Amino acid sequence: MAQQLPCVSSPRPLLAVPAGRWRAGVRGRPNVAGLGRGRLSLHAAAARPVAEAVQAEEDDDDDDEEVAEERFALGGACRVLAGMPAPLGATALRGGVNFAVYSSGASAASLCLFAPGDLKADRVTEEVPLDPLLNRTGNVWHVFIHGDQLHGMLYGYRFDGVFAPERGQYYDVSNVVVDPYAKAVVSRGEYGVPAPGGSCWPQMAGMIPLPYNKFDWQGDLPLGYHQKDLVIYEMHLRGFTKHNSSKTKHPGTYIGAVSKLDHLKELGVNCIELMPCHEFNELEYFSSSSKMNFWGYSTINFFSPMARYSSSGIRDSGCGAINEFKAFVREAHKRGIEVIMDVVFNHTAEGNEKGPILSFRGIDNSTYYMLAPKGEFYNYSGCGNTFNCNHPVVREFIVDCLRYWVTEMHVDGFRFDLASILTRGCSLWDPVNVYGSPMEGDMITTGTPLVAPPLIDMISNDPILGNVKLIAEAWDAGGLYQVGQFPHWNVWSEWNGKYRDTVRQFIKGTDGFAGAFAECLCGSPQLYQAGGRKPWHSINFVCAHDGFTLADLVTYNSKYNLSNGEDNRDGENHNLSWNCGEEGEFASLSVRRLRKRQMRNFFVCLMVSQGVPMFYMGDEYGHTKGGNNNTYCHDHYVNYFRWDKKEEQSSDLYRFCRLMTKFRKECESLGLEDFPTSERLKWHGHQPGKPDWSEASRFVAFTMKDETKGEIYVAFNTSHLPVVVGLPERSGFRWEPVVDTGKEAPYDFLTDGLPDRAVTVYQFSHFLNSNLYPMLSYSSIILVLRPDV
């Protein structure tokens, strides 16, 4: 038996969870790569003739000369001209539209035009064959359609060529595929509803652009925040307003989200990290169990905003989604909030060889995907295929896409899902070295991690992308873990998974983590300082869309994912959670109080750590998913922001989180540009100046000099015992409590406007006068230095 290649899909595998599987019972068009080639699945409408290239021969007395006959389309209303090979995609020019698409292996190609009604009826309005002599330059097919009748129409391509999966080729003239450079994609009209006839994969087509841009940016400019000043909020756009309690006019849409942006401003958030908003198919896994691809980590087209997040759906050929996304960004900027997009360039929705032919696979499979010599798909993504990111054509495509979202859509940065895949060597299908230098006969093995990946180099040094935020999820499903070691050119930040794990361990009282926890508070210098990076290259988080919510982290010791339909096999088993003594939501009063303290402790840690804090949508009010740590497939309340719950608890956890983000912004010392020095930061134990870094230590405290507050004292007691701590003496000053998670709200955060604040502080005077402070078990405190008057 042949040896199985690492992370290569087996001869006929199913897609790996959690991405779902290509099930035998999935409904949709039979344009599946694993099936044999079929007859044309779309037919041209009889009302309009197909324009064909005709070569006319004229006899002359001296010689024979071939003359290309002038061609027309759409009943003679449009002229068909040679066109230009650049730029790729559909480009509105004076008098018409230029179409250009890369395909290195196709022997024939045609442009398919759709009227919206014909697309819905699953038929091509008109097909324009491309002449390989006139309409091809190198590996780019191109054509210019002159005339106004294209406005409001849609387009796709047919490609013919070799269909040989064992050689990595899937050319099949029976499929109309979507242009990777399409700026909007139109398919089904309503979110979560199959097309007429029950199809979950109806024919898709790209929007033909208009020659003018009607969107009013109202003078919008980049906010240009320094990354050290960010407070990031990971948000799912549909989930943010889909719950009935949002009371928005257009729930689950870009416009609906705009109506709730003031909540984020009030919360102190100045950066949104949007979960995937590229065009994807939420019915990708649809079956009798009605599972959805809710999160959207399975892209169909990287240039197109998700059409079914638009309040207008597909009624305007996709223009509505573009303009509503722009409106969302513009209105966020007006409120001082940047927008970062979560982009999934590690794989696509086409899956493995049993997946559908939608776009990349039918255009040039061996260019766009990592393939083994016998055509198998490498599976470093865990989702059936791996995007061939460092191939010259693919990396050019990715950079073009990022530039578009920055220049046209005004986004402020990107978070790259499974970014370690972007560092792996590409498939080499020719004897030519695609890395541009002689290799003396040795080829880089497909998937090898590269020290200087060409794609990362291009992005890092691109003049247009130079000032945007770049965040890497520095690992992949193939076991490559690069946190602290991602190739960075001093511009890439990382989701700091080590911060998450260390903070979870220490806050729940695990021995042996005091020193590592202190490292996290300093911005993880052991990870980032030696490589020349700064604390703000660490994106600090405790919870994200993957895994438990903050409330579930302190409520469940085990995951409860049965509702996902995978027998609880999916999702992370290593959660480092602690239920505080009783499993589940319904617990005793003492356990519930402890859970409240723990949630606050985590949030205090996030806000006092050097680096960039990020928290997940709903954690500010204690959203629960019932212990499900992998809710990728649920389009209901478990993934919806509960505005009613936020209001119910506005005086409790939400108030605390809002005040903590405000406190962080007020303290210059909590967002330093460089790692704190010993002159500014001092460590303490139960007694000042005597930190305990022993294996059994569950107490960490520090003081930090601050330009606005003078000095702050922060302590974490994660022992099961209360403790009275000694405070550093400061002549002429006294310590005053601001935060104490051991106290019930509103005394957990003492504000100047609290009616009985003075009385509360006075109650501690007998301790404070002696430079002491009592701490409950599993609690954290913040004190500030005040003049002793």
Curated annotation (Swiss-Prot):
Xref: InterPro entries: GlgX_Isoamylase_N_E_set, Glyco_hydro_13_cat_dom, Glyco_hydro_13_N, Glyco_hydro_b, Glycoside_hydrolase_SF, Ig-like_fold, Ig_E-set, ISOA1-3-like_C
Enzyme class, first EC level, given as a word: hydrolase
Loss of function: phenotype: In maize kernels, mutations in SU1 result in, increased sucrose concentration, decreased concentration of amylopectin, the branched component of starch, and accumulation of the highly branched glucopolysaccharide phytoglycogen.
GO MF term (any one): isoamylase activity
Active site: 417, 473
Subcellular localization: Plastid, Chloroplast
pH dependence: Optimum pH is 6.0.
Source organism superkingdom: Eukaryota
Cellular component, GO annotation: chloroplast isoamylase complex
Pathway: Glycan biosynthesis; starch biosynthesis
Gene Ontology biological-process entries: amylopectin biosynthetic process; starch biosynthetic process; starch catabolic process
Tagged with keyword Chloroplast: yes
Its EC number(s): 3.2.1.68
Catalysed reactions listed for this entry: Hydrolysis of (1->6)-alpha-D-glucosidic branch linkages in glycogen, amylopectin and their beta-limit dextrins
Keyword terms, alphabetized: Chloroplast, Hydrolase, Plastid, Transit peptide
Comment on activity versus temperature: Optimum temperature is 30 degrees Celsius.
Site for Transition state stabilizer, residues: 546
Protein's name in the database: Isoamylase SU1, chloroplastic
Organism: Zea mays (Maize)
Classification of source organism: Eukaryota, Viridiplantae, Streptophyta, Embryophyta, Tracheophyta
Chain's gene name: SU1
